[in-house]
C-alpha cells in the first residue's frame, strides 16, 4: 500500500485540474505507483501466487484505462506513457 503522502504527490503531479482525482491519467499513475511498489516483493517471493493475482489484476486494469485514454485522446495517452515511462 502506498503512503497517503506519496499518493497525494502522484495525484497532484498527474491531475488535469486542482480537484481532479478520478481522471484516467490519475488512475493510471496511482496504479503504476502501486505496481512499482509491489514488483520487488515478487522478485523476493516468487511463489506468492495469490499476491501475483492481485498484481496482474492491477496491470490489467491499468491496460484497460490506457486503452480507453488512447481511444479518447491519443495526445494525452502518449504524454502519459512518456511521463510514467511505460511501454506502448
Swiss-Prot record:
Keywords: Ribonucleoprotein, Ribosomal protein, RNA-binding, rRNA-binding. It comes from the Bacteria. Part of the 30S ribosomal subunit. Forms a bridge to the 50S subunit in the 70S ribosome, contacting the 23S rRNA. One of its GO terms (cellular component) is cytosolic small ribosomal subunit. Belongs to the universal ribosomal protein uS15 family. PANTHER family: RIBOSOMAL PROTEIN S15, BACTERIAL AND ORGANELLAR, SMALL RIBOSOMAL SUBUNIT PROTEIN US15M. HAMAP family: Ribosomal_uS15_B. SUPFAM superfamilies: S15/NS1 RNA-binding domain. GO terms for biological process: translation. GO terms for molecular function: rRNA binding; structural constituent of ribosome. One of the primary rRNA binding proteins, it binds directly to 16S rRNA where it helps nucleate assembly of the platform of the 30S subunit by binding and bridging several RNA helices of the 16S rRNA. Coiled coil: none annotated. This is Small ribosomal subunit protein uS15. It holds the Pfam family Ribosomal_S15.
